[in-house]
């Protein structure tokens, strides 16, 4: 059994977790998350410099609380891991330097973890998670991707958003409608009072230069613009904006686009298991629609636990534990951080010559 201390500071959550595994059973001993939503809500989104400063302020206390709650002394930890890519560079640096400093101080191995692999690994804390190969829909504030996951974490990106990620579109539309930040939960809440069929919003596609459309890729910028034009038109007519109806219609279209393209991709590639992870995976409309539509194709859906959909260190620890199963992974203490790295290059974080 391995015990991992994991740190996540890629955006606006400061999180430390102690996790372990016994074979294929993964356990969370502690998972402390300090959110910065109140600090950023007044600006309508994350301010990178402010986020990095808050990580510096909060991380020592979050680390202490995680160790105390787990009742595991740091000397008993086998590996220390942190998110090193992708994310906000200043934020990543805080967590990475802290993790590598602890490794040096306590003579522990270090594992740099890809943030998206962390999200992907959140499913390991659910019951009966699938064995590879399977298709993952990773849908969050910064990313919307379809990833085929093979043995030993061989990953192939099959689809992605070419502009706004789904979560980013939720935030922008929420702000447009005068709702609180973050937009995802705010839209989901008010949409329950609305008519999801009231407005016929577009399901945008990406043109293929060879003709037709890219069938597994996403675009949410046009949908966001359509909502803007709708609001402008209603304002021009002097009518009251039906916020619940617009929110419900927007939420429905986002869910339909995600579900339709995910199921088509899984069906085309002969994959009978779909995993849904990331912050937007907490959306109830998306969860129910994915299960319902996948069932029609005899595809099984595995949903990340609600409390592990948004950024947290437990998922980073799970990714580290999964890597340790192969007994061949350790990152150099010279490994830096990077704002971007495609998920299919995650294995380079454990090579003798680090990618950054």
From Swiss-Prot:
Superkingdom as given in the UniProt entry: Bacteria
Cofactor note, please?
Binds 1 Fe(2+) ion per subunit.
Q: Which UniProt keywords apply?
A: Acyltransferase, Cytoplasm, Iron, Metal-binding, Transferase, tRNA processing
At which positions is Fe cation bound?
115, 119, 311
Which molecular function GO terms apply here?
Answer: iron ion binding; N(6)-L-threonylcarbamoyladenine synthase activity
- Give its localization: Cytoplasm
User: Which Pfam families does the record cross-reference, listed alphabetically?
Assistant: TsaD
Catalytic activity annotation:
L-threonylcarbamoyladenylate + adenosine(37) in tRNA = N(6)-L-threonylcarbamoyladenosine(37) in tRNA + AMP + H(+)
Chain positions recorded as substrate binding sites: 138-142, 171, 184, 283
Q: Which cofactor does it need?
A: Fe(2+)
UniProt-listed Enzyme Commission number(s)? 2.3.1.234
Any one cellular-component term (Gene Ontology):
cytoplasm
What biological process terms from GO does the record include? tRNA threonylcarbamoyladenosine modification
Identify its protein family: Belongs to the KAE1 / TsaD family.
User: What does the record give as the function of this protein?
Assistant: Required for the formation of a threonylcarbamoyl group on adenosine at position 37 (t(6)A37) in tRNAs that read codons beginning with adenine. Is involved in the transfer of the threonylcarbamoyl moiety of threonylcarbamoyl-AMP (TC-AMP) to the N6 group of A37, together with TsaE and TsaB. TsaD likely plays a direct catalytic role in this reaction.
Q: Which NCBIfam families match?
A: gcp_kae1, T6A_TsaD_YgjD
| PANTHER family for this protein | TRNA N6-ADENOSINE THREONYLCARBAMOYLTRANSFERASE (PTHR11735), TRNA N6-ADENOSINE THREONYLCARBAMOYLTRANSFERASE, MITOCHONDRIAL (PTHR11735:SF6)
**Protein name in the entry:** tRNA N6-adenosine threonylcarbamoyltransferase
**The species this protein was found in:** Prochlorococcus marinus subsp. pastoris (strain CCMP1986 / NIES-2087 / MED4)
What gene, per UniProt, encodes this protein? tsaD
